[in-house]
């Protein structure tokens, strides 16, 4: 998760003899995360696919065919939550489960995050009649930002938060 990323930066800095510089980097990343939390306080409920607290129901599509997403073991669940969303697959066992199209249809996401890569440029066909597709709530985030738990996760967090709640980032 994000806290572990920041701890790892500091630990590596200590090991490599650059503890002060590493701490400054980790501190700056933590400040960016804290700024997102401040902006996302008091989310307005503005759509039918939002929870009562304003969080958006999100499906993260890692691969279009076969359809892979994030499950309970993925660090990306925390990222979606910190960005003002709730992963509709957070309770599925495994970190990156393959799911059926029937399961995907039943999830009813309000937004779809695509891990942007050449084989994952659009939502799986199972979502063609979903609210997310009909309302154009399909967002691409560079796969390099999402695929590794490192400093770039903060960039991904900022992008996802802006996509899910553009009204808060004017």
What label would you give each PLM region?
Residues 1-15:
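Flexible loop/hinge segments that line or gate small-molecule binding clefts
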Residues 12-15, 19, 32:
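Mid-sequence acidic-hydrophobic segments that form the walls
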Residues 1-3, 27, 32-154, 168-169:
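Binding-cleft/active-site segments that stabilize strongly anionic ligands or cofactors
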Residues 21-27:
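Structural signature of PLP-dependent enzymes
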Residues 16, 164-169:
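Short, hydrophobic alpha-helical segments
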């Amino acid at each position: 998760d994000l806290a572990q990323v920041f701890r790892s930066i500091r630990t590596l800095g200590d090991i490599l003899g650059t503890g002060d510089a590493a701490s400054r980097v980790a501190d700056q990343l933590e400040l960016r995360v804290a700024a997102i939390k401040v902006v996302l306080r008091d989310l307005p409920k503005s759509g039918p696919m939002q929870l009562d607290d304003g969080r958006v129901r999100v499906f993260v599509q890692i691969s279009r065919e076969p359809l892979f997403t994030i499950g309970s073991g993925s660090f990306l669940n925390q990222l979606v939550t910190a960005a003002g969303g709730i992963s509709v697959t957070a309770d599925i066992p495994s970190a990156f489960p393959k799911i059926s199209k029937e399961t995907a249809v039943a999830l009813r996401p309000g937004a779809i995050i695509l891990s942007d890569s050449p084989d994952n440029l659009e939502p799986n066909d199972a979502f063609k009649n979903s609210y997310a597709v009909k309302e154009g709530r399909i967002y691409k985030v560079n796969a390099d930002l999402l695929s590794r738990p490192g400093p770039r996760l903060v960039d991904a967090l900022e992008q996802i938060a802006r996509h899910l709640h553009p009204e808060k980032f004017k």
